[in-house]
Amino acid sequence: HLEDITRADFYGFVVPFVNELMKMSAQAKIPVRIRACDTMGYGVPYPEVALPRSVPGIIYGLQHYSDVPSEMLEWHGHNDFYKAVANASTAWLYGASAVNCSLLGIGERTGNIPLEAMVMEYASLRGSLDGMDTTVITEIAEYFKKEMGYKIPPMTPFVGKNFNVTKAGIHADGLLKDEEIYNIFDTEKILNRPASVSVGKTSGLAGIAYW
């Protein structure tokens, strides 16, 4: 558990420390999983940025300078700079086999990596759900709201009440003509959430017609 790795001395401390861990792992014949922790959400997903902030640099460095196998490398992120999902996806793409998540991103301070976001990210990257029933995401959100009294911010992607709900008349007009125009994927099939409208001062005739 490499705490606060995005503010650590990567070459002076992290690499030598992990090298010793890997030696002990080999001697004891016990696999050691290395978790790179962006404890303060300070990491960035850009390969050009200097270590220790660069997530690509961290994942690459642990694999190539400390010989950590991809299958034993995971990422743990926070969302202080709105980069939890971007950093987690980058960690995957650069070789980490796993990312730590929490339901609805609930966690310390501004939260952790939302599990539902990474499920959708996985599907986007792989082009397949690989058997996952993603309608459970909606069921989980409803459980949190009804049984636990948890208030999900309305604008939260995939689970907020405003997700795939339009208030704009021009969008409603597009939905009337072809749902694909303003619904980025089949939200009813994937999340059991059909596209809908909220009628208000910006709805126009099309919004009322769709409603």
Which role fits each region the language model picked out?
Residues 93-114:
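Glycine-rich phosphate-binding active-site loops on the catalytic face of alpha/beta enzymes
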Residues 107-137:
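C-terminal helical cap(s) of enzyme catalytic domains, especially alpha/beta-barrels
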Residues 18-26, 59-67, 96, 119-127, ...:
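Structural signal for hydrophobic packing residues in well-ordered secondary-structure cores
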Residues 6-10, 46-50, 54, 79, ...:
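Catalytic cores of large soluble enzymes that bind and process phosphate-bearing ligands
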Residues 1-71, 89-96:
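Alpha/beta enzyme core
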Residues 1-3, 37, 74-78, 99-104, ...:
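Generic beta-strand/beta-sheet core signal
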Residues 81-86:
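Short glycine/serine/threonine-rich phosphate/pyrophosphate-binding segments
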Residues 128-211:
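A mid-to-C-terminal "edge-of-domain" accessory segment
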